[in-house]
Amino acid sequence: MLKTSPFSPEASLLMSLRNVLLLVALLTRSPSLFAAEPAKAEAELNSDGPAAGHSYHGEAFNEGPRQAAVLIEGMSPIKFETSAKTPAAQKFIEQGIAQLHGFWYLEAERSFRQAAKEDPELAIAYWGMTMANANNTSRARGFIDKAMELRKTNTTRRETLYIEALDRLIPKPKNDDKKDDKKPDREAEREDKKKRTERYLSDMERLLHDFPDDIEARALLALQLWLAERSGVKITSRYAVNALLGEVFTANPMHPAHHYRIHLWDSARPDNAVQSAAMCGPSSPGIAHMWHMPGHIYSKLKRYNDAAWQQEASARVDHAHMIRTRLMPDQIHNFAHNNEWLVRNLIHVGRVQDALDLSRNLISLPQHPRYNTWNKRGSYKYGRQRLIQTLTEYALWDELIKEAGGNYLQPTEDDTQQEEWLGWLAVAQFMTGDTKQASRTLRSLQRRSLVLQTTVLDLEDQQADEAENKDKTDEKPKDSDESKTAEKPEEQEKPSPTLDEVKRHITQLDQILARVRSAEAVKKKDLKVFNDQLPKGRLNPLIQAQWQAEIGQVDEGIKLAEKAVKDSSSQVRPLAVLVDLLWKKGNKDEAKKHFSTLQKTANAADLNTPMLAKLAPVAKAVGAKTDWRLPDPPKEDLGDRPPLNELGPFRWQPYQAPTWGAKSPDGKLVAGEEFDGKPRIIIFYLGFGCLHCIEQIHKFSPLYDDYKKAGIDVVAISTETVEELNEGLKNYGEAINIPLLSNGDKHIFKQFRCWDDFEDQPLHGTFLIDHRGKVRWQDISYEPFNDAEFLLKESKRLLALP
């Protein structure tokens, strides 16, 4: 533990002045340094310059990629002439456009930033950054403003048309001085957006008229014609847009605009995009989303095996890229959505074990408060939902009960989701005959219901009191009790639920309770309770069909199963349930007929799954083999499909942390190997002169002992030299539990990629490294990660996983 004397404001000012004077001296002695990085130098000399870790070029550059781009294999060979002064800048522009076509916006922006680093005056590079931020208008505005500024020199007329068209599309910032505009005029905003979109379409047509050989303009116009519906500009003819795309494919049959044709026909006529579905992935095999998109078409056409192949290909390409570039999974566009849809398709085709494995894998991925928690549409939420779905729809009650004590379906702070899980746990306990434990779980749900009902009564009393007070004169001053009541909301971390919210919660819980009571009635053969509770439980139709058959309502169950087969054709589960119920009813000929269909549908299914294993007598009766599945006949419309293992690994794996060595305040070398064999948190901070960094240390230091109790070491590495580190410690006024180390030459920052390659400056970083030296969690940003409690909880979760 380090204890130091108080750090006075005067000392802080002197340190800041010393640093500024040192910088001025360095710049005076080395004019070339100033010339090489004018924005950086100007910002550092300006007292109003950016905080440590922030971009020298403005706030728009803070978010997004900060590490250098490389030329990636598997990008479509785009031709897009620009004013680039170097071949490298031109290559990165063309790579960026290929990535735009694949909606790979993070990497597209990285490519365009690399082009700008190669050629700082290249206006079209900032146009590309704008295009890569189509869904982030504040950042897009900053980039297009820069492009407009640079377009005045060394820019061709064609490039200028691209830039000016996009400038008119991106909304200008509103005037904050208008105090009278209390509420935005939504209708006026919609109309303005529509007009800007119509003007952009007109501008792109003008560009095409002047440069008719510009294939990329055709592709981007086709995309915008499809996107324009979101801005109120309707597509009057999809076939006209399709014809425009046809001109692109005439010039380049493997153009990545196959992606746009899939979007064009996805919801309208998916069969019109089968050819593009076959060519989309091979047109840009290094972009995961290009493998994902054909899955839309195949899913709509109920070709679930083909869709699952596409989604697995997408996942593998993403996994390979993440491991190669050290990104965390949910930083990747569309990653979680692709994988959760893959689980749904695996359920459809009966690949139950793969569905379970992938769901658990999604849950196991690193959580982050910005993009992967229960409240975000990330891997954790999707994984939990799909794991429960797979277990319940395939009636894997024993496995579901095992999860109650496992690492994947742990208790959650979200009441409604915890109740959903407890409800299914009670169902599983009843279905497996553990009536005692099931009743205990049911009572816990009933207690929750009583608490909610009491809350409703309290809120109704509160509303009545408020209504009564409104009728009274307000001449009487508020008493102390009323003042205390008014202060209560400030003491709460989140607002109390409203009466309507609590009532909706009760409705959801009542549905869960009805589901549990229905399961209890099935096992007790209590038909009266079953008939009363079943409609309230809103069960999945196939679960309901099986429960009805078990309680004796076989005919009703068969009707539900027949409807499910009709509504969900080409899916394994409806057919399996129908065959089972028909066989139990004695309708063996009908069962055999549907079984013959199931043999083809279940060509990739897990036959050891209980739902399918119970059909062995039917298979024997029709003379089928033990493995009664029939192979899927080869299709001629799938295009060239590479072996899946060539695209990447099936699962994301954490990467190996770099080796490192830093100096302690006494100048001794501390090697990273000293932490081998035990988990550790490494914090990269930007010195005592960085106020945000000190705030981070403030957050983590009080929890140092809690981390140690969890078996996790914590160490912080600074950009300061040993001398600067000691001076900071001397002037700092509080105890610091966390060992602080010096990395004055910043090579460790670069090794861990806590470095802005574009502006040559360090970034904030926080890492969890396990006992094997694998990086299990990370945050690299222009701001430090300050939620020490979240990371402690998440570290415990991740380290407990197998």
What do these predicted regions represent?
Residues 17-32:
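Bacterial N-terminal signal peptides
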Residues 694-734, 746-750:
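Structural microenvironment flanking redox-active thiols in thiol-disulfide oxidoreductases
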Residues 222-226, 231, 238, 256-268, ...:
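Alpha-helical adaptor scaffolds
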Residues 604-659, 673-676:
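N-proximal helix/coil linker or "cap" segments that precede and/or mark the start of modular domains
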Residues 37-261, 270, 282-284, 301-313, ...:
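N-terminal alpha-helical interaction modules that lie
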Residues 762-802:
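Thiol-/selenol-based redox modules, centered on thioredoxin-like
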Residues 671-700:
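Short active-site neighborhood of thiol/selenol oxidoreductases, capturing the structured segment around
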Residues 90, 124, 159, 164, ...:
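Residue register of alpha-helical TPR repeats
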